[in-house]
From Swiss-Prot:
Protein's UniProt name: Small ribosomal subunit biogenesis GTPase RsgA
Matches recorded under NCBIfam families: ribosome small subunit-dependent GTPase A
Record-listed E.C. numbers: 3.6.1.-
PROSITE patterns per UniProt: ENGC_GTPASE (PS50936), G_CP (PS51721)
Length: 291
């Protein structure tokens, strides 16, 4: 029996990496009976057959798991946002941060296309990013002439997953970091202000200290796993301020003596962050119940 990490899934075949050696495996029928499927990122025990093939017997407990797309045991989630084309959006960034925290993932913010944005656009984005740095988020800016290896060297060891809407430059980033990958890229749609999906499945690529993965571009972010009462925990600044509210179950919407709203009025919590919290809270409150 060998132990390795699933690095790719295509047509029901799980490719497992064991210290640089790859095996094509399939899960035993027991998994199907239990209605449980391994995912990319899983640590598995498998039995070798025919030298480079085998059957998965056991999946180790997951530290965390992203549902869409399915990938597990992530050490850092890099949220890729472009400065322009598509334009930088704090609302979208906050939604990705909520997703990250809801799945117990450590997020990092990476701003691409630094070189094609105007000086005025970059200064405006940098002023905004300072607010995220104050909250505690690690942030980086890159452009075409950046040192991609130095950028990645700042990241955690283990599995790094790139996430972000289509067209922000995730595949371009990976191609610049590892030119041998030759991943397909597309220009963004001018009418939709977003890119066409070019990554169709999750695959882990080797890097110094671990792996790196692109994810299929998101056309919509799914918050169905989050209850409205949980949302405040996924806005880090709001969560910390909320500990001083008069009522323990304060949702910072209409409740009296709310410390969060006091800090928003004082400018200590950015108004746009609170607005995004309210918008998402209302969306979750108004969603239809699924049966």
């Amino acid at each position: 029996m060998k132990t390795g990490r699933i690095v790719k899934l295509i047509s029901g075949v799980y490719q497992v990496d064991v210290e640089g050696e790859r095996f094509d495996t399939k899960p035993r029928g027991l998994f199907r009976k239990k209605k449980f499927s391994p995912v990319v990122g899983d640590i598995v025990d498998f039995e070798v057959q025919n030298t480079k093939e085998g059957y998965i017997h056991h999946v180790h407990d997951r530290n965390n798991e992203l549902k869409r797309p399915p990938v597990s045991n992530i050490d850092e989630l890099v949220i890729v946002m472009s400065a322009v084309e598509p334009e930088f959006s704090t609302q979208l960034l906050d939604r990705y941060l909520v997703i990250a925290h809801s799945y117990h993932l450590k997020p990092r913010i990476l701003i691409t296309k630094h070189d094609i944005a105007s000086e005025q656009e970059i200064l405006k984005i940098k002023d905004t990013i300072k607010l995220y740095q104050k909250i505690g988020y690690a942030t980086q800016f890159i452009g075409k002439d950046s040192n991609y290896t130095a950028t990645v060297d700042e990241w955690s060891d283990g599995l790094i997953v790139l996430s972000g809407q289509s067209g922000v430059g995730k595949s371009t980033f990976l191609n610049s970091y590892q030119p041998q990958l030759k991943l397909e890229t597309n220009d963004i749609s001018k009418s939709l202000n977003r890119g066409k999906h070019t990554t169709r499945h999750v695959e882990l690529y080797d890097r110094k200290g671990g792996y790196i993965a692109d994810t299929p571009g998101f056309s919509a972010l799914d918050f169905n796993h989050i209850e409205k009462e949980q949302l405040k925990d996924f806005f880090i600044d709001i969560h910390e301020a909320g500990e001083q509210c008069k009522f323990r179950n304060c949702n910072h919407i209409k409740e009296p003596q709310c410390h969060v709203k006091t800090l928003v009025e004082k400018g200590e919590i950015p108004q746009f962050r609170y607005d995004h919290y309210q918008q998402l809270y209302n969306e979750i409150s108004n969603r239809k119940v699924r049966y």
